[in-house]
């Protein structure tokens, strides 16, 4: 028989740098999860992706055990990295803060494909282009 799920926790953590400090500690502590065990397992699995922020979905079961799924980095993070920016525009559509090429958009779309609700690469590219526009990043050919 399957274990009963008591909670699902969604966090965005830097790869290989999860610590018991907030936001990890309080989020897991209130569900009775062994925080150090999660940190060790997460850091071991993400050590090769250093410097990236990764969304993680932690499923907590009735017996206080847990499993977690690491997703692809947020599109906004990948776009800022591609454009060489620290943050997006404070006034998107009015103030353009960076540029990315169609080739970069395609690479990001390929990376994000498993997590996007898109059937084709073209549809995924349109989603990423929309994210870029909302951040004040211009898409050039």
From Swiss-Prot:
One MF term in the entry's GO annotations: large ribosomal subunit rRNA binding
PTM info: One or more lysine residues are methylated.
Gene Ontology biological process terms, A to Z: translation
Gene3D superfamilies with a match to the protein in the record: Ribosomal protein L11, C-terminal domain (1.10.10.250), Ribosomal protein L11/L12, N-terminal domain (3.30.1550.10)
InterPro entries given in the database record: Ribosomal_uL11, Ribosomal_uL11_bac-typ, Ribosomal_uL11_C, Ribosomal_uL11_C_sf, Ribosomal_uL11_CS, Ribosomal_uL11_N, Ribosomal_uL11_N_sf
GO cellular component terms listed in the entry, alphabetical order: cytosolic large ribosomal subunit
Record's keyword terms, sorted: Methylation, Ribonucleoprotein, Ribosomal protein, RNA-binding, rRNA-binding
Family indicated by similarity: Belongs to the universal ribosomal protein uL11 family.
PANTHER family membership: 60S RIBOSOMAL PROTEIN L12 (PTHR11661), LARGE RIBOSOMAL SUBUNIT PROTEIN UL11M (PTHR11661:SF1)
Cited function: Forms part of the ribosomal stalk which helps the ribosome interact with GTP-bound translation factors.
Subunit structure: Part of the ribosomal stalk of the 50S ribosomal subunit. Interacts with L10 and the large rRNA to form the base of the stalk. L10 forms an elongated spine to which L12 dimers bind in a sequential fashion forming a multimeric L10(L12)X complex.
Protein's UniProt name: Large ribosomal subunit protein uL11
Organism, as annotated: Thermotoga petrophila (strain ATCC BAA-488 / DSM 13995 / JCM 10881 / RKU-1)
Gene label: rplK
């Amino acid at each position: 028989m399957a274990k009963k799920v008591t909670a699902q926790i969604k966090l965005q953590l830097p790869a290989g740098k999860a610590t018991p400090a907030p936001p990890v500690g309080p989020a897991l502590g209130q569900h009775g999860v062994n925080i150090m065990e999660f940190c060790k397992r997460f850091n071991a699995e993400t050590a090769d992706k250093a410097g990236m922020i990764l969304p993680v979905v932690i499923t907590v079961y009735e017996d206080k055990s847990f499993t977690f799924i690491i997703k692809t980095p947020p599109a906004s993070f990948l776009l800022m990295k591609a454009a060489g920016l620290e943050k997006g525009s404070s006034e998107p559509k009015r103030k353009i803060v960076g540029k990315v090429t169609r080739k970069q958009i395609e690479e990001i779309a390929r990376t994000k494909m498993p997590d996007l609700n898109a059937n084709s690469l073209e549809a995924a590219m349109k989603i990423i282009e929309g994210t870029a526009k909302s951040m004040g990043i211009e898409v050039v050919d």
